[in-house]
Amino acid sequence: MSFRPLHDRVLVRRVEAEEKTAGGIIIPDSAKEKPQEGEVVAVGGGSKAEDGKVTPLDVKAGDKILFGKWSGTEVKINGEDLLIMKESDILGIVG
């Protein structure tokens, strides 16, 4: 199934959480927090102003991003867990 977000929405794949701490302690699944870093998979066409002009999004597919802990809606597309969020939920682009 192909999916393209609408307007100012962004489809994001979370990066995997670290399995170990820097000191070598293995973190059990129950203690892991959801990662707040991801990769943009697809973007919508942009937000529409009152005058009808469309403003393109600042992020593009392939960008590594940081987002808020509670940002986005979890969805499953082609068996993969992804997030759909507004561009305003994105804190910044990494790198």
Swiss-Prot record:
<dbReference type="InterPro" id="IPR011032">
    <property type="entry name" value="GroES-like_sf"/>
</dbReference>
<keyword id="KW-0143">Chaperone</keyword>
<dbReference type="Pfam" id="PF00166">
    <property type="entry name" value="Cpn10"/>
</dbReference>
<dbReference type="GO" id="GO:0044183">
    <property type="term" value="F:protein folding chaperone"/>
</dbReference>
<comment type="similarity">
    <text>Belongs to the GroES chaperonin family.</text>
</comment>
<comment type="subunit">
    <text>Heptamer of 7 subunits arranged in a ring. Interacts with the chaperonin GroEL.</text>
</comment>
<dbReference type="GO" id="GO:0051087">
    <property type="term" value="F:protein-folding chaperone binding"/>
</dbReference>
<dbReference type="InterPro" id="IPR018369">
    <property type="entry name" value="Chaprnonin_Cpn10_CS"/>
</dbReference>
<dbReference type="GO" id="GO:0046872">
    <property type="term" value="F:metal ion binding"/>
</dbReference>
<comment type="function">
    <text>Together with the chaperonin GroEL, plays an essential role in assisting protein folding. The GroEL-GroES system forms a nano-cage that allows encapsulation of the non-native substrate proteins and provides a physical environment optimized to promote and accelerate protein folding. GroES binds to the apical surface of the GroEL ring, thereby capping the opening of the GroEL channel.</text>
</comment>
<dbReference type="GO" id="GO:0051085">
    <property type="term" value="P:chaperone cofactor-dependent protein refolding"/>
</dbReference>
<dbReference type="GO" id="GO:0051082">
    <property type="term" value="F:unfolded protein binding"/>
</dbReference>
<dbReference type="InterPro" id="IPR037124">
    <property type="entry name" value="Chaperonin_GroES_sf"/>
</dbReference>
<dbReference type="GO" id="GO:0005524">
    <property type="term" value="F:ATP binding"/>
</dbReference>
<dbReference type="GO" id="GO:0005737">
    <property type="term" value="C:cytoplasm"/>
</dbReference>
<protein>
    <recommendedName>
        <fullName>Co-chaperonin GroES</fullName>
    </recommendedName>
</protein>
<keyword id="KW-0963">Cytoplasm</keyword>
<dbReference type="InterPro" id="IPR020818">
    <property type="entry name" value="Chaperonin_GroES"/>
</dbReference>
